[in-house]
Regions:
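Positively charged n-region of N-terminal signal peptides that target proteins for export
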Residues: 1-4
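Bacterial N-terminal signal peptides
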Residues: 7-18
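A structural boundary/capping signal
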Residues: 23-209
Length: 209
């Protein structure tokens, strides 16, 4: 366990060195998480590209389970999240794909969709329930469409984002949240009702709305 923890810390140290101002905003949230989960609403049209992905990856889009899961955020589970976040961010090299194309990083390259799908697959391989691993779409502070992996835990809904190094609470990102997949099935999406205003603990500034 000690060697595993030291390895994870080494990965995190390398990852922190490569990210910019967005990462700096979120670093204060790597210890304390909010318990507030996302609030979802009506059914919405799934993101472009999902249908093509499901045609090629049927197993990924089948019904995940009967009940939504909230994973207990034990030290080992937390370490899983940090390792997967760091490893996938380092393993996949950024490349702008068409937003209509979703897929895994078969050639080692991809966009935000690729990072989110790879993290979901990696956590499933480590024994995490699919019903706790949810893809979510948002609009960034610069107005760009973005996809991330949201993990439902006892410590809150946590985000694994390719734009920053740490795992963060969803309320701490300067995004306008749009929609999220249903817990049981990747092909069903719902609106995200709560759109929190990010407050910088360092500067006391609010970003987004």
């Amino acid at each position: 366990m000690l060697s595993r923890g030291l390895a994870a810390l080494s990965f995190l140290a390398l990852a922190f060195a490569g990210f910019g101002s967005l990462d700096a905003r979120a670093q204060s949230d790597t210890v304390a998480f909010s318990a507030a989960p996302m609030t979802t609403g009506a059914l919405v049209v799934p993101p472009a590209g999902l249908l093509g992905f499901c045609v090629k990856n049927l197993a990924e889009c089948q019904r995940a389970g009967e009940m939504p899961a909230v994973v207990d955020l034990s030290p080992d589970r937390r370490l899983d999240l940090e390792e997967v976040q760091t490893l996938v961010n380092a393993r996949v090299h950024p490349r702008e794909n068409s937003r209509h194309e979703w897929g895994f990083a078969s050639d080692g390259y991809g966009d935000c969709n690729t990072y989110a799908l790879e993290k979901r697959r990696e956590l499933v391989a480590r024994g995490w329930p699919k019903t706790a691993l949810l893809l979510a779409s948002a609009v960034t502070e610069t107005g760009e469409g973005h996809l991330v992996l949201v993990v439902r835990t006892s410590g809150g809904d946590l985000v694994l984002d390719n734009r920053l190094a740490p795992v963060v609470d969803w309320t701490r990102l300067p995004y306008r949240w749009v929609s999220r997949q249903n817990e049981q099935r990747l092909t069903i999406w719902v609106s995200i009702e709560a759109r929190p205003i990010y407050t910088s603990s360092a500067a006391g500034q609010k970003v987004g709305g």
